[in-house]
């Protein structure tokens, strides 16, 4: 049994902090790797910015619908094992991912730190719109307003409720497991600063991450690690 398995068995309150590497095995590309979403693209950050949404809504809509949605993607073993652990322990998942796969796997306590592509709303009247309808048109049939997905774009702030929920879970956790993220994007990477100092921290990632305090690094493929849990 590896150290992570042992820690998961002993822990009562667990927080998983997940990034793009968790969804890559489900066929959803990450952003910055050589095969990632941004590879070979000019100004992808602009296309996913608040400025683009406001100034060029058609361009924004085309980019998002053609590059961000993977409706046929299914949860992989990482998502499934996390959901399974939640049936026995107090688990909160705080994810940078916007693909809804943790919920699809059956996880109930998920904080979508950067929002979700599957929550959409009209910017004019505020009405919630299904992602299915958004994928057909970004114009709200009821009022003519422009629909957007409820995700955090460049130039936008993380929602206060996402930060509050995350900090509450982090402070209570006796085990924090960072999975599939380089853990460099702020404020996500600052969440562990608010941990209970007795909490153990593990990181499972193909590349080593750095933290300014002790943690246990598993430089490995997360799929292999979670298959053994």
From Swiss-Prot:
Where does this one sit in the cell? Cytoplasm
Q: Which InterPro entries match?
A: DHS-like_NAD/FAD-binding_dom, NAD-dep_sirtuin_deacylases, Sirtuin, Sirtuin_cat_small_dom_sf, Sirtuin_class_U, Ssirtuin_cat_dom
The keyword RNA-binding is annotated on this UniProt entry: no
- Any Pfam family from its record, for instance, is SIR2
Kindly indicate whether the keyword NAD belongs to this entry.
Answer: yes
Q: Reaction catalysed by this chain?
A: N(6)-acetyl-L-lysyl-[protein] + NAD(+) + H2O = 2''-O-acetyl-ADP-D-ribose + nicotinamide + L-lysyl-[protein]
Give this protein's Gene Ontology molecular function annotations: histone deacetylase activity, NAD-dependent; NAD+ binding
Q: What does the record give as EC number?
A: 2.3.1.286
Against Gene3D superfamilies, the record matches this protein to: SIR2/SIRT2 'Small Domain (3.30.1600.10), TPP-binding domain (3.40.50.1220)
Please state the protein's primary subcellular location: cytoplasm
- Catalytic residues (UniProt): 114
- Entry's Gene Ontology cellular component terms: cytoplasm
What is the annotated role of this protein in its UniProt record? NAD-dependent protein deacetylase which modulates the activities of several enzymes which are inactive in their acetylated form.
Question: What's this protein's family per the entry?
Answer: Belongs to the sirtuin family. Class U subfamily.
What is the protein named? NAD-dependent protein deacetylase
- Organism field: Listeria monocytogenes serovar 1/2a (strain ATCC BAA-679 / EGD-e)
Per UniProt, what is the name of the gene that codes for the protein in this document? cobB
